[in-house]
Amino acid sequence: MNNRVHQGHLARKRFGQNFLNDQFVIDSIVSAINPQKGQAMVEIGPGLAALTEPVGERLDQLTVIELDRDLAARLQTHPFLGPKLTIYQQDAMTFNFGELAAKMGQPLRVFGNLPYNISTPLMFHLFSYTDAIADMHFMLQKEVVNRLVAGPNSKAYGRLSVMAQYYCNVIPVLEVPPSAFTPPPKVDSAVVRLVPHATMPHPVKDVRVLSRITTEAFNQRRKTIRNSLGNLFSAEVLTGMGIDPAMRAENISVAQYCQMANYLAENAPLQES
């Protein structure tokens, strides 16, 4: 028997499809999401409706974004969900969540079992819409969740950690074994809750500058920032901000990265592209 076939659908490797089938895990995720009627609920990658059905049962209307044409067609003819669903058959990586929030008249509550092959770039895409999002609940590769929640001075701490925590409060919810999926992935999974900050704890003047600094620092994470960021900051400037130039990228807090970004935005602003 082909273990990539679930409910008559062949899981597509190119879409990173692994279908959730453990009822206890499904119930735990839905409980964590706690969907309520009247909320603007949006699911990314509903697949075979493992989460769509129990969430949809609690709602009058649910928006889903599904790239796979066959799966989108199955949802359109779903026996009890069909009339409740608004289906966008397109790539979430190019979806305009801001336009959808404006159309629905309220911030979105976004959830999904994200394809692991695009989870990190998709997170960055979603961060650009946090003004339009109330919260997010995602099943991700456990290693990605570890990176999202990691603090300074740890191996998991990186650019994703800094940018996620700049935009959101990041809360791990539960861990999920490979056996909860068909086909079973080769990695452990975990569910995470991300709640965009109502008030930014560390506001930056230009988030593009923060993105540039974190990219350059973590691309050379074994170097001291005196070397990795030497083209942006002198040792004297870093010391003046209370940041030791001998530290490495993983030693610098989110607050310090934001401090550096604001200095650069004031003293060497990026040109509008």
Curated annotation (Swiss-Prot):
Specifically dimethylates two adjacent adenosines (A1518 and A1519) in the loop of a conserved hairpin near the 3'-end of 16S rRNA in the 30S particle. May play a critical role in biogenesis of 30S subunits. Its main location: cytoplasm. S-adenosyl-L-methionine binds at N18, L20, G45, E66, D91, N113. SUPFAM superfamilies: S-adenosyl-L-methionine-dependent methyltransferases (SSF53335). The lineage of its organism: Bacteria, Pseudomonadati, Pseudomonadota, Gammaproteobacteria, Enterobacterales. The keyword Cytoplasm applies. It is an enzyme of class 2 (transferase). GO terms for cellular component: cytosol. This is Ribosomal RNA small subunit methyltransferase A. It is found in: Cytoplasm. Its EC number is 2.1.1.182. It holds the Pfam family RrnaAD. InterPro entries: KsgA/Erm (IPR001737), rRNA_Ade_diMease-like_C (IPR023165), rRNA_Ade_Mease_Trfase_CS (IPR020596), rRNA_Ade_methylase_Trfase_N (IPR020598), rRNA_adenine_dimethylase (IPR011530), SAM-dependent_MTases_sf (IPR029063).
